[in-house]
């Protein structure tokens, strides 16, 4: 059963990471939203479904199963797409290795859907 105290701590750490990273994904560098998505999708002329993949998630740099905590130094802000794809793998790669892999794909416009690049959401 989830611990409400841990959930609250993760939420605070995610928010701190979002601010520290200037609202950009740790892996792909894409702009993200935290809280109410409507301001984000209206500002970038997106459909709500499009904005969903750019929702800020709290990414454990050291997985909880490996002893990671919800402390701010172990949480990075990652877009939902990057977080999902990292953990969909059989063995999630180390954060730095995954970031390098993602950035190479971003450079080829081969990670996010074309509209992300067209809207200028990736630096």
Write out the residue ranges for each language-model feature.
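Cys/His-rich metal-chelating microdomains
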Residues: 31, 64, 81-85
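Short C-terminal domain-edge/linker segments immediately following a structured domain
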Residues: 57-59, 87-95, 107-114
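Short, intrinsically disordered terminal segments enriched in charged and Pro/Gly residues
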Residues: 1, 99-123
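Histidine-centered nuclease catalytic patch
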Residues: 32-75, 90
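The −1 position to Zn-ligating cysteines in a subset of zinc-ribbon hairpins
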Residues: 23-24, 57, 78
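Short, charged surface segments at domain edges that flank catalytic/cofactor-binding sites
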Residues: 1-42
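Short Cys/His-centered divalent metal-binding micro-motifs
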Residues: 75-97
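Glycine-rich, phosphate-binding/catalytic loops in enzymes
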Residues: 42-44, 95-98
């Amino acid at each position: 059963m989830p611990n409400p105290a841990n959930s609250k701590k993760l939420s605070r750490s995610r928010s701190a990471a979002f601010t520290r990273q200037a609202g950009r994904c740790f892996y792909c560098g894409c702009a993200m939203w935290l809280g109410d998505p409507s301001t984000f999708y209206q500002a970038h002329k997106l459909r709500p479904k499009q904005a969903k993949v750019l929702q800020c998630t709290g990414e454990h740099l050291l997985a909880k199963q490996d002893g990671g905590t919800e402390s701010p130094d172990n949480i990075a802000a990652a877009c939902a797409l990057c977080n999902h794809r990292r953990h969909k793998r059989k063995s999630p790669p180390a954060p730095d290795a995954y970031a390098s892999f993602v950035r190479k794909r971003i450079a080829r416009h081969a990670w996010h859907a074309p509209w992300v690049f067209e809207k200028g959401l990736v630096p």
